[in-house]
Regions:
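Conserved NAD+-utilizing ADP-ribose enzyme module
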Residues: 1-16, 24-26, 42, 63-179
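Non-heme Fe(II)/2-oxoglutarate
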Residues: 40, 53-56, 87
C-alpha cells in the first residue's frame, strides 16, 4: 500500500449522500508515524474528513487492526489540528488510558463511535469541550487519549465507561497540553 488513504478509504463509492444521516460535527482522521520525530503539522497526514453517520461507519470498519495498533491516529472535531499548539487545544489537556494490545482494536472502535455519536458522555456541557481522541502505540500496549479544549473538566467519571467495555478510569491520568 502506498498511502494511509489507500488503507482506510471506504472501498465502495456511494453515488449520493442525500439520504445520509448528519452527525452534529465534522470529524477528521489524522495519522502520524510513531517513529517520525517531526511534530510539525506537515508530518501529520489528513486521512479522511466526514460528517455523516454512514461515512463514519465505513471509515471505522475499514481501518485495519494492524494500523490501529501500530500507527498514531487522531480523530479530531471540526477544523482542530492534532497538535497541542492548535488554538483549540493549547489551553486544554487530555485523559490518558493505558490499553493492552489485545483490547486496543475493540476499545478504539467503541471510542470512535461514542465520540462521533455524542454518547461519550451524558453531560452535554462536558461534551462541548471534547476535541478528539488519539491512539499511540507502545510495545505491549497503546495509550488512548481523550483531548479536552480546557483544563476545567478533569473528571474522568463523566466519560461513559459503561458503553466502552475495557476502558476503566482507574489509572487514568489528566495532563495539560502546554504549561
Amino acid at each position: 500500500m502506498n498511502s494511509y488513504q489507500e488503507m482506510v478509504e471506504p472501498k465502495e463509492t456511494i453515488e449520493s449522500e442525500t439520504n445520509f444521516h448528519n452527525l452534529s460535527d465534522k470529524w477528521t482522521l489524522w495519522a502520524h508515524l510513531p517513529h517520525d520525530t517531526d511534530w510539525s503539522i506537515n508530518s501529520y497526514k489528513n486521512i479522511y474528513t466526514f460528517n455523516h453517520v454512514e461515512n463514519a461507519i465505513a471509515l471505522c470498519e475499514t481501518i485495519p487492526e494492524i494500523m490501529i495498533k501500530n500507527c498514531m491516529l487522531f480523530l479530531m472535531k471540526g477544523s482542530i489540528k492534532p497538535t497541542w499548539e492548535d488554538p483549540q487545544n493549547k489551553s486544554g489537556g487530555s485523559f490518558s488510558f493505558k490499553i493492552l494490545n489485545k483490547n486496543v482494536f475493540e476499545i478504539w472502535k467503541q471510542l470512535f463511535y461514542s465520540l462521533v455519536g455524542n454518547t461519550i458522555t451524558n453531560d452535554k456541557e462536558y461534551l462541548k469541550y471534547i476535541n478528539g481522541i488519539t491512539i499511540s502505540p507502545k510495545k505491549n500496549f497503546c495509550i488512548i487519549k481523550i483531548w479536552m479544549s480546557n483544563c476545567k473538566h478533569q473528571n474522568p467519571d463523566k466519560i461513559n465507561i459503561d458503553i466502552i467495555k475495557g476502558l476503566g478510569i482507574q489509572g487514568c491520568l489528566f495532563r495539560k497540553h502546554l504549561s
